[in-house]
Amino acid sequence: MPSVSESDELIFFVNGKKVIEKNPDPEKNLLFYTRKVLNLTGTKYSCGTGGCGACTVMVSRYNPKTRKIHHYPATACLVPICWLHGAAITTVEGVGSIKKRVHPVQERLAKCHGTQCGFCSPGMVMSIYTLLRNHPEPTPDQITEALGGNLCRCTGYRPIVESGKTFSQKSTVCQMKGSGKCCMDPDEKCLESREKKMCTKLYNEDEFQPFDPSQEPIFPPELIRMAEDPNKRRLTFQGKRTTWIIPVTLNDLLELKASYPEAPLVMGNTTVGPGIKFNDEFYPVFISPLGVPELNLMDTTNNGVTIGAGYSLAQLKDTLDFLVSEQPKEKTKTFHALQKHLRTLAGPQIRNMATLGGHTASRPNFSDLNPILAAGNATINVVSREGKDRQLPLNGPFLEKLPEADLKPEEVILSIFIPYTAQWQFVSGLRLAQRQENAFAIVNAGMSVEFEEGTNTIKDLKMFFGSVAPTVVSASQTCKQLIGRQWDDQMLSDACQLVLQEIRIPPDAEGGMVEYRRTLIISLLFKFYLKVQRWLNEMDPQKFPDIPGKFVSALDDFPIETPQGIQMFQCVDPKQPQKDPVGHPIMHQSGIKHATGEAIFIDDMPPIDQELCLAVVTSTRAHAKITSLDVSEALACPGVVDVITAEDVPGENDHNGEILYAQSEVICVGQIICTVAADTYIHAKEAAKRVKIAYDDIEPTIITIEEALEHNSFLSPEKKIEQGNVDYAFKHVDQIVEGEIHVEGQEHFYMETQTILAIPQTEDKEMVLHLGTQFPTHVQEFVSAALNVPRSRIACHMKRAGGAFGGKVTKPALLGAVCAVAANKTGRPIRFILERSDDMLITAGRHPLLGKYKIGFMNNGEIRAADVEYYTNGGCTPDESELVIEFVVLKSENTYHIPNFRCRGRACKTNLPSNTAFRGFGFPQATVVVEAYIAAVASKCNLLPEEVREINMYKKTSKTAYKQTFNPEPLRRCWKECLEKSSFFARKKAAEEFNGNNYWKKRGLAVVPMKFSVAVPIAFYNQAAALVHIFLDGSVLLTHGGCELGQGLHTKMIQVASRELNVPKSYVHFSETSTTTVPNSAFTAGSMGADINGKAVQNACQILMDRLRPIIRKNPKGKWEEWIKMAFEESISLSATGYFKGYQTNMDWKKEEGDPYPYYVYGAACSEVEVDCLTGAHKLLRTDIFVDAAFSINPALDIGQVEGAFIQGMGFYTTEELKYSPKGVLYSRGPEDYKIPTITEIPEEFYVTLVHSRNPIAIYSSKGLGEAGMFLGSSVLFAIYDAVTTARKERGLSDIFPLNSPATPEVIRMACTDQFTEMIPRDDPSTFTPWSIHVS
């Protein structure tokens, strides 16, 4: 190889500061570097795969050709540090900070209430900030698109979008979609009338600081000089195991590729990076040709466009946008098809990192672009050192990786040529994914047809399908047989049969959904057929008939709209003192810190001297005996200090049925067997891979509820309530309907995974733990038991958690004990951060449920008798399963009075990781079954489900089935307001009209009511304590036993203290929750955090005010600070402990009666959806929510909880699907496999109203709203059910069918039975083992 001038110096800038690294390690990424080297912890680790956006940063590069600076978002977890040469990186700290200046983006995100737990907030800030650097006055659509790669589990996205829209040229935060009028304008019909004393503004735009784009930091001039330097040198960075080479010229690149033919070319690292992380791929050499000019050229000719392989997908989209606007429509059909897919392919961060060449070369089977490029006759321009430039057709053989059509190892893709389309050629791209954006396709297709000029005779036809085989496949034989045919219905019928014969998906194919994917192949083909038929009609209306009018809506995918809406809540009494903050929509106490990245989470804490990191080794078998455990290789690995097993537990390894370390037997895949402690997490993880475990399987292995029933395997005794004479009533009803509903589980997907820092103390066997938990006392209990020391020696500190939703009630106790045992054995601090995949595997989630019902009713819809059975899949240990099944049974009537009612429930023991608490605690599962049988009764009676709900709803003060008295008046009010103000009946009529005019798309509406019980039926869990200190300067330090999970609990407690002490809220500070300040605290769950802790804070403050009252009487006109000084001088204690005994709840299961709950939260939600019957996709058009909030202490926080819970519930009922193998292995272990809602799934119109009432039992007559909105998400499920029912009726099918949860596209499509579902081949279940199974 000729001598080349080289350098080993990496130069880049971070937040305006120059960074120089000599020989950086190519295996280190930017996220690690910013957090661990530069101590910039605002950028968060959440998934590690580029799928959540929490680690978003802004990358800025200078292009010497255009002489422009390009700003774009990137996920730091996928960016190798060596990739940064010549780049300027901006992290959230570089945008603004409390110490210096808070940027308007950060301020508005916080003040618009766009943060809750705050873990996703820095990523949200960076996405909006990057957009503003490119578009200082963005459109609402640009804001929505910019946030498409960021996940939030708390807020429901609406306030985040709203904060971004404040930067739009004409703010649209309170405008109807398209009308330009305020939602509250009397002429607008989104809400039919204005409420007296109702407010709609959660923040004051006048408080925002102005945004001046001219004041942003400049791009470092040194980087411009570097980019324009004509004498650039090759860069070579030699790491411990790998070498990273950055060539300067094309010849240099080709020389390197010839010398290292197996070295991957890394441009965006979106393919190579995940392969290294998850598939243990290793490459000794990486070549990164980012700066090679020839890879970044674009050239247009009369025949088409040539686009450089180095173009990012975002640049590709911009180029296509320009070409489509400049060229005649007939020439750009391929470009248009690519444009459409580029809008939803991944998220903006990945689109700005991934390149056209990398995407084309890697040829993933799920590729959205390659099928279209192939259909559009694209060719690949390939070069090599030998000078043998060649054009490789981007066709079936290339995509199927046939050797004769593949790239040679030494070749480099230079560019892609995309020809213009011919006049009589039509190209289309089609896809269907679990959600609209940032999700791999379940099936996609690129199709092209060319006709003999002026005819509908097929001259050429191409069809390529993705996600149906290990590679993208071509239906080439089908296409050959159709050449010369007319484009008509008979051709379509033959094409469907042929393509199903040619493309065979095995019944046990990876990814499952086999029958659905087979259906999608021909459903997408039919869509293409319709598109072409419509296009032919446009070409010559006289010669070619148009498609039927009822088919037109099938042509287009659902558009992505910017959400609009309004929030209504009761205004504060104008007589209330100005400094009293109770009732005001106050920003989250940590909102600004969330947005600036200065809110400290556990892994943001600085490293401690001699700190070790912990990695877990988990079982790969569901039920087996451990025959051997060999840790010798792990112990010999670099940096490893020790391996910890069950033998190292000084105390209890099995505490209350929960096992820290498996010892002789494993009872689920994912059970912890041992942990490895090392100096770095990478060393610990590498060593963990070298632990050798041998097993002998034990029978039976029980995975599903049905298998548990078969083996009589249960975790708890049966729970039962019954009223009336059920058996007698069944004999005296007009009709009986029976059925069963399967409700699958749900992953918490809190943005911050389980995180613990355990620090052994030098004296008295003390241990200090910092962790994110909902239940510090429980952690203390488990650690105490494991270490065999008194609880008083264990101190648990909890500042905040990055989301929890029930997943941090019990699990941190087990994991905390595992961590503490490791710290105890090594005598060194241990940092234990679960990776997302391990977190999802180990901690499990919501209980899957099987519900069976038998309902007796009269022909008018009145239900006289119900016999319901519930079974939950509890997993392998008790955890919270018994309590969950109790809640399921107690809450199983929802809002309905059924005089003869029997409900039974049991928690099943299976060989899955133990399921645990989750927001709603069984209510979201149980009530789906209730509403399902309501819908079944409605169908039998030929009534609307809403009519049956109204008929059977509680109407006056009554007793529940468990004999608790309650007044349903607030329920009736929410129900009535929801029906009226959502214009349900008018919109239902409009939907019917739409459905009559559209065969392949249907709209559905549903209104569901809710009676949600707050707190738990165990009295001692409802107690709380608080500690309040007043300092001599008048400032107040507040602490209590509640945990901040994002719900704003501390903010509300500050409001309470401010009112009770009659001081401004700025005087009150909350530091942390700790077992050393408030011991023996109950868990923060059950929607009761503000209730019980608020009472305790109130009590403490009242005690202090009683002490201060004599002082105040002496000096009534004095200031607070003067009173405090006087009190101190008179030796009056300025500290007080407050206590709340708790709600006195009880439940006697032997008598089947009690008063298990202090009060109920009532509500109703109306949702409207549109369903694509050909694909199973759906779009949520509008949601109206009415929740009985009584008197809201903080409407902004309460509305945030309602909206966030609703979107989380909507995800539970639609997109979120956990997939298990028949052997109990969880497949869904990250955002690429598990799809929580993104910004594109939220309602296009979203209206939330907090209905005022009274609740004298709670503090300030408030109610706990943390969980109530979760079940209301089922209004989307039942709206889908309504739409599918309409489709089935039109097709002559039964309108009673099991629409199980979640209603994924697969479930929806296969329920819409038609000629295409009937056409697909079926397999005998006894002849194969499916790839995945349902566990409910």
UniProtKB/Swiss-Prot annotation:
Keywords: 2Fe-2S, Cytoplasm, FAD, Flavoprotein, Iron, Iron-sulfur, Metal-binding, Molybdenum, Oxidoreductase. It comes from the Eukaryota. It comes from Mus musculus (Mouse). Residues 8-95 form the 2Fe-2S ferredoxin-type domain. Aldehyde oxidase able to catalyze the oxidation of retinaldehyde into retinoate. Is responsible for the major all-trans-retinaldehyde-metabolizing activity in the Harderian gland, and contributes a significant amount of the same activity in the skin. Is devoid of pyridoxal-oxidizing activity, in contrast to the other aldehyde oxidases. Acts as a negative modulator of the epidermal trophism. May be able to oxidize a wide variety of aldehydes into their corresponding carboxylates and to hydroxylate azaheterocycles. Homodimer. Highly expressed in Harderian glands and sebaceous glands with detectable levels in the epidermis and other keratinized epithelia (at protein level). Detected in testis. The expression is 3 times greater in females than in males. [2Fe-2S] cluster 1 binds at residues 47, 52, 55, 77. This is Aldehyde oxidase 4. Binds 2 [2Fe-2S] clusters per subunit. Binds 1 FAD per subunit. Induction: Repressed by testosterone in Harderian glands. In skin, induced by UVB light. Its main location: cytoplasm. Mo-molybdopterin binds at residues 116, 154, 804-805, 1045, 1086-1089, 1201, 1265. Belongs to the xanthine dehydrogenase family. FAD binds at residues 265-272, 346, 355, 359, 368, 413. The lineage of its organism: Eukaryota, Metazoa, Chordata, Craniata, Vertebrata. Disruption phenotype: Mice are viable, fertile and born at the expected Mendelian rate. However, they show a deficiency of retinoic acid synthesis in both the Harderian gland and skin. The Harderian gland's transcriptome of knockout mice demonstrates overall down-regulation of direct retinoid-dependent genes as well as perturbations in pathways controlling lipid homeostasis and cellular secretion, particularly in sexually immature animals. The skin is characterized by thickening of the epidermis in basal conditions and after UVB light exposure. The active site is at residue 1267. One of its GO terms (biological process) is xenobiotic metabolic process. Its cofactor is [2Fe-2S] cluster; FAD; Mo-molybdopterin. The gene is Aox4. [2Fe-2S] cluster 2 binds at residues 117, 120, 152, 154. One of its GO terms (molecular function) is iron ion binding.
